[in-house]
Curated annotation (Swiss-Prot):
One MF term in the entry's GO annotations: ligase activity
UniProt KW Cell cycle keyword: no
Residue segments, region Condensation 1: 769-1047
Highest classification ranks of the organism: Eukaryota, Fungi, Dikarya, Ascomycota, Pezizomycotina
Record protein name field: Nonribosomal peptide synthetase verP
Domain of life: Eukaryota
UniProt region (Adenylation 2), positions on chain: 1089-1469
Upregulation: Expression is regulated by the cluster-specific regulator verZ.
Provenance organism: Clonostachys rogersoniana
């Protein structure tokens, strides 16, 4: 932001920065900056109508107030200058003098008293009213006058030393300088409130006015009588010492200056005592020296005590300000540098005024030119001294006109009399001294009036020189002051005379009193309807936004009311003397029916503090005495009252745990707002009573003590290290006991590497801006509830915006009122709750047995779990309105349902946290704990109850119970025995707040066992006691709540909302009994234990009716294990032919019991693949289920083939004893082979330890237990198959095998299955009524599938790489919720890392990495893959971490979201596209789209998406084509154009891989074959008609834009919006020229970007039979030795360059796969010899540089390794070196064609560009494929017409006009140009000058150049004007700016000619290396 040079610009910048901040706060009207700007514009228009202009000063007759400020701005905006007159303090004589002096000027009167000007004065405009607010519309035609920096802004009339007013001319520049100079501008910022009391005609008043208005502060104008009223809210003050002396002391009790942090004093010298009083109170006091003639600028000094003597020197005025240089000179104006040498003070700089009004002679005498500077001679004397800290400063020695002769001696009244007499009189209580010389000698006046003046004179005789002692001293209470607040010395002598005559009467100062501002409305009592509608509208209105007018037929909740607002409505009606039970509002009656129920009540029934009865007064007195005696407090230094019952309940647990019942909120702010918010919070901390409130349990039965003065200090800690800052923010302790703390943490980035110096807490300077600020408020719950926090946060925001801080109500009075209500209505409330709870059994009241946890020893018992909602708060609110209820009601019902399912009980008691403030009339704004937890009873016994009925019943209960919101817990009949509560949280600041918060976070430590806190967004937190609820139970409760909340919105019956939750709870509790615990056992041991535990249960069942009990299974598998150990002794790995039969399962388990590792082979795979797997894993035997399958075995030596049926035949069964344990925890259980992304199988070892670790986690066992039936559904080679088998058999469940003829048949006979989403998409859950639990594995799950499957079943999303033992996370999927894979298992750690292995921030995407015990040790025979994927955990040394290759992010709730594979990044049309991201966008649409599955593929440069739709939705009215159109429309809105698919294809059944996943390669093949034909139609020789033009043009668009052939182009389609750019439009022009046989250039295409325009353009060209065409002239072709113009330019630059390596071009290519390296070398050598360009050298001859051709071409050089760094710094000798060098490094043995190699091409820009390299590689590919290429005789690029074509006249004319007006030297440095370019991208636009950037021009317009080798790359100037950048309109959209810049670049491109021609045509020297057009090239490089 540029520094403003006029006050109008200064204010405009502030109004733009902070439009909604309060600018002025006064009874005449409080205005924001936007409003102040508007109303001052309106007044400016009025002034312009009176003829006011730059040449006519305006006399402003004014006083402090809003109108004064509006008028000042209006005068300045019309270009006039302001002549302020203080009507409140100036005598009429002086007013008349100024009006006559500034004759014929308009007089603007803002005072209420009319003004009659004297003769000769101008017109009078009275301005005492204004328009503002939402209805105000400023005059749209007003435009502020363009004000120059040197224009006069003010004429300030001062009395001076002569008494005759003189007008000082002060410029805009001078006042801007003051307002922007620290610290004389008091460092005012947003949130600061300036107590504006200086006279409005005082120069310093104008300075401070714009110091505030120019820096977004708030001005609080105040006359003397208003100071005490306005001061408490202000943070800064400008005053004279005399004014300050008359203000109350800042150290008194309840000081009105508790918020004041900075004071600036000037005008006269203050006494040391006065200064000490303020700085000792912690206020920063600045002494400013300056006179009106220097715009109050000169020097400034911060008052400090001498650290040795504790004294204050009041005469020090500071050192030299850079903006206002100051000197001390002798009488000859020679500079005095010596210390203690007195001289005159002179001041220079831009603060020096312009002179005196109409007094040129005086101007010349006082404003002189001296040593090259214009300075002002002040007439003041001073000298250089050293202050207490050794700094060189000026000590003020008085004015030269204050030096008088007394008794023949020169005496300085300031120094010799006043200062000396003050020192003498300190012991007499003297506070100030003023002296004046009279004809009889020196007289003095001292204060106060009780000073013994006679004794003072006598003592002075002992110390002072006799000629310095006044002959007469008078004592008064107040000194006479001028209107500017200075002491009037010329009245002192008269004052002495009056004292002597005894006629002096001191003026009495009456205290101002506040007038009554709130007037009660008078309402008729005819049914009270009008009152009810008016009050309800006010209650429903938002701040600054009125609610619509309510009608009698409206009902409260239907129009948006809530339960909290209902109680507020009752409270407000009570203030009007009206009473209505809240339950009547909850009945959803129209207002017309509610009004008759309102009754009147006497106002006297309201209990107030002033009505204390005797008993209360006695109680308070006793508490006061006890506090003094027991706590040592001083009487009258505090207020005290009793604690409420709730406060006592909250306080008692904290005695044992200082962090119990503590609330903490953290709010972070970024740099623009950090300073404001820091000051706002610190001001609130000092002034808010709650922060000086103490809870004492030692006094009475517990007391609340409110101290009069703050006794707690906030903490400020600064950090320059980001990590330490974040660590400190996280580590703020919550153990504050019964008190509170405020921590202010700041983060400062330091660019110099030096540490940031922390600022102490009492330092108030804001000169250093903070990069980030975090405020942490930690407070005990007894001091503050949620609504109190909201009140505090609102106050902080108001303070930050400049508004005054509203006073909080008395918490002691509120407590007394609450206790009185509770006591007076005790019997009533007890009777009510006794009846309400009568049907509830005791076990539902007291906490029963809840899920116990094994709490870790020493860990906190309080835990917090965060959940994202399934239904947004907006949806809940809308649903509540639809049902005429409150949002809280919906949440209460959902929570009750969740608890009912968890407890398996139909009766539930929920604690509802409600505010009891509505019962505390006149105490609604008290800060404290004013809420109650009331019991809500829910009964879910009626299976037919509807959701609507339940909502109505709950609303009635809320209304009835809410009547007793004031009740104590014991009065509710259950005390604090409720174990669960729900609390609606108030919103915290966010990015939309004013000022905005960067982030917020809250934490609580409740004493309740289970608390649900619903945030304003709908997300919720669960606080639970870990000794009663474990983590898994808390997660289930949260999931129950989410499901119930969603179901309430979509189900009809209540029981249907609870079915799935009850199922989940039953499964969880049943499976918990049989869940494995961590142990040192192996799988064999666990398996044998289960077989012995459940011998008669069915273990395995097949499709043919075959069944085996666990006992039978045990024996048969023992036989197989025995056979394996005897047949293949010491075998390690056994392969299994996995045909899905019982024999296969027997073989698998037998292998495990034999202590071997098994590997499943897929019968569907080829024999060769099975052989490959057996070889890789080293299998020693193959186990066939049946001997008849022998032909399926690979023919391998040393592979023993065994058959299970043969093992179990005959006498073998007698060997059924238990086998010894051969395996260990670390030995492998199974080897899983996956194809991966390469197609080659990779072997993954899963050990016993890692597998059993996975099985011990919650949910990984598929909730298996005896009686559960689990399907074996997955492919045997899929890792999840192992989870199916062992989840069943390790937990006593039944494993149901597949039917080979019907893969879905076994799902009819199971209740649990693991299924891929692909399979889920094609089956109907209704066909499988027994299926209760589904695990989705292997693929992403769509929201549509979630919605369909979760209506009656549990759906879990399972994720885990096989490398991490199958599962690493699982998540119950709930409709409406985000689809994630949940939180990591307890046995793994999941990190999200970037490419450099650094952690990503929450929410950011990165690679999913998994660490922990489940990570594999190694791959089988894949060391490179292992080295790449299996790393050491950086944070846990010695443990492994696996890089999954999956893209993911972790949300705020800790759940992992997947975004596809990282390796699915493709490049289409030059843009990077994440296929996984496209798929995610497709499936994350609304469920109504019905997308069940999708796959994105890239084929031939096109982005294609395949989708399938839900079967149930295919019969809707929309066809698949219409669904695809809707989907495509949404994707165009949501995705970048490059990521929008060119085509979406519907498919019923996706092709599958062997593991059941979608086969994308098969889709690519399918699409290629489907789209293999072209739709291009032949065009005959017949006349071209419009349809054929359209067809041809459409075909060319599709080719250039790479659109699919079927794309139907619309007439409105825009070439650029479909992906076109500058290069593609050139290509289109070339293709259209060939297609239509007419020359079509970019110049014709640019004005016609739409399809319709181009049709018309082509048609018009074709219809013209003859037309004049300007053909360019041609030069003779270039000779072989001649250089092109570009080659010459590059050669010249190469000769003079300091870094010639900058001209190097290097390309490194990694070659992998089946490439014949020798053949590749031969092809490269062929191409190097074809075009002589590669044999070129450039030599300097007599005619300049020329080309010579070498005899031989360069060849490929084979090297062992290549040093890239060295190549980059290779210095080509253009005359002797080959200018292209090709290197090849093999990475295997020569002749090994399957290995990989590195190809490096190094060349010089003199002969090549990027196009050359691309063509070189393309030619190499052609030669490699076997094609023969013919060698050329001369370089092909020399034949291009580009070198011989002379630009046409129109082309030359274009460039002359395009660059017209551009100065030859821009006057910008490289750095400034870089800033300008950066400004373009950062939207910080500059209108200072034109920008011309150099852009690359490929120089290859035709196919001849496009296919040539050689250097064509040229430069093209792109002019970007201020208009392009939007400087003419600050609201210009970014897209419009980009379009303008693009248009300019395309214009240049369409007229491109040789850059050398452009330079020549502009008249610059030919061949100049440093052309003046631009010094910055802008490139876009695609890597």
């Amino acid at each position: 932001m540029t520094l403003p040079t006029s006050l109008c610009d200064l204010f405009a910048q502030a109004a733009s920065r902070c439009p909604d901040n309060l600018a002025v706060d006064h009874t005449e009207g409080s205005l924001t900056y936007r409003q102040l700007d508007d109303v001052s514009n309106s007044l400016a228009n009025m002034l312009m109508g009176l003829g006011v202009n730059q040449l006519s000063p305006v006399i402003l007759l004014t006083s402090h107030g809003t109108f004064n400020i509006i008028a000042t701005l209006a005068i300045l905006k019309v270009g006039s200058c302001c002549v302020p007159i203080d009507r409140a303090t100036w005598p009429q004589e002086r007013i008349n003098y100024v009006c006559q002096t500034v004759a014929n000027s308009v007089i603007l009167n803002t005072t209420s008293e009319p003004f009659m000007p004297s003769e000769g004065a101008g017109d009078v405009l009275n301005y005492t009213s204004m328009q503002s607010g939402p209805s105000f519309r400023p005059n749209p035609v007003f435009q502020a006058h363009k004000v120059a920096a040197d224009d006069t802004a003010y004429i300030i009339f001062t009395s001076g030393s002569t008494g005759k007013p003189k007008g000082v001319l002060i410029s805009h520049k001078s006042l801007c300088l003051y307002s922007t100079t620290s610290p004389i501008n008091l460092d005012i910022g947003p949130g600061d409130r300036l107590l504006h009391i200086l006279s409005v005609a005082f120069d310093a008043c104008a300075c401070m006015l714009f110091s505030a208005l120019g820096n977004c502060g708030t001005i609080v104008p105040a006359q003397a009588e208003d100071v005490l009223l306005q001061a408490p809210s202000c943070t800064v003050l400008a005053a004279t010492p005399a004014m300050l002396k008359n203000l109350p002391s800042p150290t008194t009790e309840n000081s009105i200056f508790s918020n004041l942090s900075r004071v600036i004093l000037g005008g006269e010298t203050a006494s040391p005592d006065l200064l000490g009083l303020w700085i000792d109170a912690g206020v920063q006091v600045l002494i400013a020296y300056g006179v009106t003639e220097t715009t109050s600028m000169g020097s400034i000094y911060r008052v400090e005590r001498d650290p040795r003597t504790d004294a204050i020197n009041p005469y020090i005025i500071g050192g030299v300000l850079e903006q206002s240089p100051i000197w001390i000179v002798d009488s000859e104006l020679r500079i005095i540098k010596n210390e203690n040498s007195e001289g005159e003070i002179i001041v220079g700089g831009d603060g020096v005024a312009q002179g005196y009004y109409n007094d040129e002679q005086k101007t010349r005498s006082n404003f002189i030119h001296w040593n090259g500077s214009r300075i002002y001679r002040t007439g003041d004397f001073g000298c250089w001294v050293l202050d207490a800290n050794g700094r060189r400063v000026i000590e003020f020695r008085g004015r030269k006109d204050r030096t008088v002769k007394n008794q023949g001696y020169l005496v300085n009244l300031d120094r010799d009399v006043e200062a000396a007499l003050y020192r003498v009189g300190e012991s007499f209580g003297l506070t100030s001294v003023r002296a004046v010389a009279t004809g009889n000698g020196i007289v003095a006046v001292v204060t106060p009036s009780n000073v013994n003046t006679s004794a003072l004179i006598e003592k002075a005789k002992d110390i002072m020189c006799s000629y310095c002692i006044p002959y007469r001293i008078g004592a008064v209470d107040d000194l006479p002051l001028s209107p500017n607040g200075k002491v009037q010395h010329n009245e002192l002598a008269e004052l002495i005379k009056i004292i002597d005559e005894g006629q002096h009467n001191q003026e009495n100062k009456a205290d101002s009193q506040l007038s009554e501002k709130i007037e009660r409305g008078k309402f008729g009592d005819d049914r009270h309807l009008d009152t009810l509608l008016t009050v309800a509208r006010d209650v429903l209105s938002l701040p600054g936004q009125s609610f619509r007018i309510l009608q009698p037929h409206d009902s409260f909740f239907a129009v948006g009311g809530s339960s909290l607002l209902a109680f507020k409505l009752v409270s407000v009606l009570g203030q009007h003397g009206l009473n209505i039970p809240a339950r009547e509002l909850f009945k959803n009656q129209p207002f017309s029916d509610v009004a008759p129920l309102i009754t009147s009540r006497a106002h006297s029934s309201t209990w107030r503090l002033t009505e204390h009865d005797d008993k209360t007064q006695q109680t308070l007195a006793e508490l006061q005495n006890q506090a003094c005696q027991m706590l040592g407090l001083v009487q009258n230094s505090f207020e005290i009252g009793p604690l409420t019952s709730l406060q006592l309940d909250l306080a008692l647990p904290t005695l044992g745990d200082e962090s119990r019942n503590i609330n903490q909120v953290k709010i972070a702010y970024n740099a623009p707002h950090s300073g404001i918010m820091r000051r706002a919070w610190q001001g609130l901390w000092q002034s808010e009573p709650v922060f000086r409130t103490e809870v004492s349990l030692a006094v009475g039965c517990g007391a609340l003590i409110v101290h009069n003065k703050p006794f707690r200090k906030y903490r400020v800690v600064s950090h320059s290290c980001r990590d330490k800052y974040e660590e400190a923010v996280k580590g703020i302790n919550m153990g504050v006991g019964l008190g509170c703390t405020l921590d202010v943490l700041t983060y400062h980035k330091t660019s110099d590497g030096l540490p940031y110096l922390p600022v102490s807490s009492n330092h108030n300077s804001s000169s250093s801006e903070t990069d980030e600020l975090t405020v942490v408020l930690t407070i005990h719950h007894s001091l503050m509830d949620g609504e109190s926090l909201k009140l505090l946060l609102d106050k902080v925001d108001r303070i930050a915006l400049g508004f005054s801080q509203p006073l909080s109500g008395s918490s002691i009075n509120a407590n007394l009122a609450l206790i009185k209500t509770q006591n007076s209505r005790d019997s009533e409330v007890r009777s009510f709750f006794s009846d309400y709870l009568r049907h509830l059994s005791p076990e539902n009241i007291a906490p029963g047995q809840v899920s116990a946890t094994e709490n870790l020893e020493g860990s906190s018992s309080r835990e917090t779990a965060f959940f994202e909602t399934s239904v947004s708060s907006v949806e809940v609110s809308d649903f509540a309105k639809l049902n005429c209820s409150s949002a809280a009601c919906i949440y209460y019902i959902a929570w009750a349902m969740a608890v009912a399912a968890f407890d398996n009980s139909p009766d539930v008691l929920i604690g509802a946290v409600v505010s009891n403030r509505p019962a505390l009339q006149h105490h609604e704004h008290a800060i404290g704990a004013y809420m109650s937890t009331l019991p809500l009873v829910f009964n879910f016994r009626d299976d037919e109850e509807t959701v609507v009925d339940r909502i109505q019943k709950t609303m009635e209960d809320l209304a009835t119970v809410g009547e007793y919101a004031w009740a104590r817990s014991d009065q509710c009949g259950i005390g604090r025995r409720m174990r669960t509560l729900l609390s609606m949280q108030f919103p915290l600041p966010n990015e939309s707040s004013k000022p905005p918060a960067l982030w917020t976070e809250s934490a609580e430590n409740s004493d309740f066992p289970l608390c649900l806190l619903v945030e304003s967004s709908g997300d919720f937190r669960m606080l639970y006691d870990a000794t009663q609820f474990n983590w898994e139970a808390a997660q289930r409760l949260g999931q129950h709540f989410k499901h119930a909340l969603y179901s309430l919105h979509h189900e009809t019956r209540v029981t249907d909302c609870m079915t799935v939750n009850r199922l989940q709870e039953n499964l969880a509790k049943q499976s918990e009994i049989f869940r494995l615990k961590p142990s040192e056992r192996i799988v064999k041991q666990v398996l044998e234990q289960v077989m012995g535990q459940f011998p008669s249960l069915i273990a395995v069942e097949d499709c043919l009716g075959g069944k085996l009990t666990y006992s039978e299974l045990d024996k048969l598998t023992n036989v197989i294990a025995h056979h394996i150990n005897s047949t293949v002794p010491n075998a390690e790995v056994i392969a299994l032919y996995s045909d899905g039969t019982i024999q296969w399962i027997l073989g698998l388990l037998g292998t495990v019991k034999a202590g071997c590792t098994y590997v499943n082979l897929d019968p569907r795979s080829s024999v060769s693949r099975r052989e490959t797997i057996c070889k890789q894993c080293g299998a020693e035997a193959l186990l066939l289920p049946n001997a008849s399958q022998a032909s399926e075995a690979p023919l391998m030596d040393n592979l023993k083939v065994l058959a299970v049926d043969e093992m179990l035949s005959g006498n073998s069964k007698k060997h059924n004893g238990k086998q010894p344990d051969r395996a260990s925890l670390d030995s492998s259980l199974v080897i899983v082979f996956t194809s991966g992304t390469t197609g080659n199988p990779k072997g993954i070892l899963i050990s016993n330890r890692s597998f059993l670790s996975m099985e011990t986690s919650y949910g990984t066992t598929m909730f298996a237990a005896p009686g559960r039936r689990i399907a074996q559904f997955m492919s045997p080679v899929f890792d999840v198959c192992n989870m199916e088998i062992f989840s069943a058999l390790l937990h006593g469940a039944t494993l149901v095998l597949r039917d080979p003829s019907d893969p879905y048949a076994n799902l009819h006979r199971v209740n649990t299955a693991a299924v891929t989403p692909s399979a889920m998409a094609v089956i109907d859950l209704d066909d499988f009524p027994n299926l209760q639990l589904i695990y989705a594995c292997g693929e992403p799950v769509t929201k549509s599938l979630v919605k369909r499957y979760t209506k009656r079943a549990l759906l879990y999303n399972a994720y885990g790489p096989a490398e991490c033992s199958i599962l690493t996370s699982i998540e119950r999927l709930i409709p409406g919720d985000q689809v994630t894979v949940g939180r990591p298992l307890s046995t793994v750690r999941v990190y999200i890392l970037d490419e450099d292995q650094h952690p990503m921030a929450p929410g950011d995407r990165g690679e999913v990495c998994v660490a922990g015990v489940q990570v594999l040790r190694d791959y089988i025979n894949a060391p490179e893959q292992a080295a790449r994927n299996i790393l050491t955990d950086p944070w846990y040394p010695g443990e492994r971490m696996y890089r999954s290759g999956d893209s993911g992010s972790i949300g705020r709730d800790g759940r992992l979201s997947l975004h596809g594979r990282i390796d699915r990044l493709v490049k289409l049309r030059g843009f990077r596209v994440e296929l996984a991201g496209v798929e995610h966008a497709v499936v994350s649409g609304p469920t109504e789209e019905g997308v069940s599955q999708c796959a994105a593929i890239a084929v031939n440069g096109l982005l294609i998406v395949y989708v399938s739709f839900e079967r149930s939705q295919q019969h809707d009215s929309l066809s698949n084509k219409e669904r695809i159109a809707q989907l495509l429309s949404r994707l165009r809105e949501q995705l970048l154009p490059s990521s929008v698919p060119q085509e979406i294809v519907h498919i019923d059944n996706f092709p599958r891989t062997i593991n059941g996943k979608i086969d994308t390669r098969a889709l690519e093949t399918q699409y290629s074959s489907y789209k293999n034909t072209s739709i291009e139609k032949a065009v005959g020789d017949c006349p071209i008609t419009r349809p054929k033009i359209e067809d041809k043009l459409a075909h060319e668009w599709r080719q250039v834009l790479q659109l699919i052939p079927e794309t139907q182009l619309q007439e409105s389609d825009d070439f650029f919006k479909l992906g076109g750019h500058s290069v593609s439009i050139m290509l289109l022009a070339t293709r259209l020229t060939a297609a239509f046989g007419k020359k079509i250039t970019v110049r014709e295409l640019l004005p016609s970007p739409t399809f319709k325009d181009q049709i018309n353009m082509v048609r018009a060209l074709l219809e013209i039979e003859t037309f004049h065409k300007e053909e360019p002239q041609m030069l003779p072709p270039l000779l072989t030795e001649e250089l092109t113009s570009i080659e010459k330019q590059v050669w010249f630059q190469h000769q003079v360059a300091t870094t010639v390596t900058a001209f190097n071009i290097i390309r490194v290519i990694q070659i992998e796969g089946a490439v014949e390296i020798d053949k590749l070398c031969q092809s490269l050598n062929n191409i190097l010899s074809i075009d002589p360009i590669f044999r070129s050298n450039i030599v300097e001859g007599p005619k300049g540089p020329a080309r010579i051709l070498r005899n031989s071409a360069p060849t490929v050089q084979e090297v062992d390794e290549f040093d890239i760094e060295r190549a980059l710094h290779h210095r080509f000798n253009l005359a002797h070196d080959y200018l292209i060098q090709v290197y090849l490094a093999r990475h295997g043995c020569k002749g090994d064609n399957n290995d990989h190699a590195t190809l490096v091409i190094l060349t010089s820009h003199v002969i090549a560009d990027l196009g050359t390299l691309q063509n070189f590689l393309q030619l190499t590919s052609t030669a490699y494929s076997g094609s023969t290429l013919v060698p050329l005789d001369r370089p092909k690029h020399l034949d291009s017409k580009s070198w011989t074509r002379i630009p046409t006249f129109s082309e030359r004319k274009f460039w002359s006009e395009y660059l017209k007006g551009l100065i030859r030297r821009l006057g910008l440095t490289h750095h400034q140009l870089a800033l300008a370019v950066g400004a373009l991208f950062l939207q910080w636009f500059s209108a200072e000058d034109d920008l011309v950037l150099g852009a690359p021009n490929s120089g290859r317009p035709t196919s001849q150049e496009q296919e040539s080798l050689g250097q064509f790359l040229d430069r093209l100037p792109i002019r970007i004007t201020p208009n392009d950048l939007g400087n003419d309109d600050t609201m210009t959209k970014l897209t419009e700016i980009l379009n303008r810049v693009r248009h300019s670049s395309l214009k240049a491109l369409s007229n491109a000619i040789s850059f050398s021609n452009i330079i020549q045509d502009l008249g610059y020297p030919s061949g100049g290396l440093e052309h003046p057009l631009f010094e910055c090239d802008c490139f876009y490089t695609v890597s």
